[in-house]
Regions:
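Extended ligand-binding clefts on enzyme/binding-domain cores
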Residues: 19, 23, 150, 157-169, ...
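Well-ordered alpha-helical segments within folded domains of soluble proteins
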Residues: 3-5, 55-73, 81, 118-135, ...
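Carbohydrate-binding/catalytic loop surfaces
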Residues: 37-55, 100-122, 164-190, 234-255, ...
Length: 347
């Protein structure tokens, strides 16, 4: 049961729906499509200047595909499905590596590969997006692509000796020295962030593809979080590891903490293991409670904290606020937590 005033919930729904339908979705539908070269523009400035010659990334295209597929499922607006189809066609026509499998990380503005390595984070986002597109329109090849990518992750990125998934591989699925997702990340081969999005993708795919191998993989990655990534003393996430699961980081990411709380709970529910469901429900509440320490009641959730330096990065990034909305709502379904209302008002 959700412990929040019904009138507040109704007002919140109205506000969120207005923001989504009058601002967020029209922004991407109006400014982002690259009508000259296909797909979507790789860069839009803060002043809404569209750079049609910027490189194009798979993660952005996958996120657009997922978003407009999900929007179509709720509102049944043909324009949303048309936007999703544009993303789907560009991913299949340009990002898909038909020789080696997987998807390219980055293309130039004309659609030619620039960065061809296999970033497992990107493969996970593509699975997530393809599955949602299948939900939206029943495109069988989209679901087949998601299943194929799952198989490639399991074949090439799973560490069968020590468990966990390798961060990145070459185009031909060979080891690479620099596996970083971005320049600010630690160059370590097993990261919480990539595992979190594999968890998200496998959860979505398992809803519609009840394959025993996928069930086993989803069960395994849930347990990697409960046993490896979540610190049971602090209830924060451990973020970077080497191949042998030696911890290589000591900072706190509040956005990832609250994101993990609800994604893990959702995954356990989809898997259908009662014991794991109960455990992950308790974890979700505990992680949400601890997450309040990063919540500024005037300005929202801070970004990171570095215990060794007793220093906080108090920048407000958009995505931790969005994850906090979902994560706190999820925790509220178990208990009488109230801090979620502060975040909702701030966002």
């Amino acid at each position: 049961m959700l412990h929040m005033d019904a009138k507040k919930l109704g007002a919140l729904r109205t506000d969120l729906e207005r923001e989504l339908k009058e601002n967020i979705l029209p922004f991407w539908m109006t400014l982002a499509p690259d009508k000259e070269h296909g797909g979507f523009a790789g860069y839009i400035s803060h002043q809404n200047h569209v750079d049609l010659k910027a490189n194009k990334g798979i993660v952005m295209h996958a996120r657009i595909l997922w978003t407009f597929s999900a929007a179509y499922l709720v509102y049944h607006d043909p324009a949303y499905l048309e936007t999703a189809a544009r993303a789907y066609e560009y991913i299949t026509g340009h990002f898909t590596d038909r020789e080696s499998g997987g998807v390219y990380w980055e293309l130039n503005y004309r659609g030619a590969p620039v960065t061809m390595r296999k970033q497992v984070y990107a493969l996970a986002f593509t699975i997530y997006a393809m599955t949602e597109y299948w939900h939206a329109c029943g495109e069988k090849e989209a679901l087949a692509s998601a299943v194929r990518l799952f198989g490639e992750i399991e074949e090439h990125a799973l560490d069968r000796e020590r468990n966990g998934y390798i961060e990145a591989l070459s185009r031909e699925w060979e080891p690479v020295e620099d596996v970083r997702l971005s320049v600010k990340d630690a160059n370590e081969r097993k990261t919480m962030n990539t595992h979190l999005h594999i968890l998200e993708a496998y959860t979505s795919l398992f809803r519609v593809h009840r394959d025993p191998r996928l069930r086993e993989a989803l069960d395994n990655i849930i347990r990697l979080f409960t046993e490896r990534f979540i610190d049971r003393e602090t209830w924060h996430l451990r973020l970077f590891f080497d191949d042998d699961w030696n911890l290589r980081s000591d900072f706190i990411s509040f956005g990832h903490d609250i994101e993990c709380s609800w994604l893990l709970d959702e995954a356990a529910g989809v898997l259908g293991n009662r014991e794991l469901e109960e455990e992950c429900g308790r974890i979700a509440v505990q992680m949400a409670r601890v997450n309040f320490r990063g919540l500024d009641h005037e300005h929202g959730l801070i970004y990171e904290f570095f215990p060794g330096e007793n220093r906080a990065d108090t920048d407000r990034h958009w995505w931790p606020q969005a994850e906090a909305m979902v994560g706190y709502f999820n925790a509220v379904s178990y208990t009488h937590l109230r801090a979620h209302e502060t975040v909702l008002d701030l966002v």
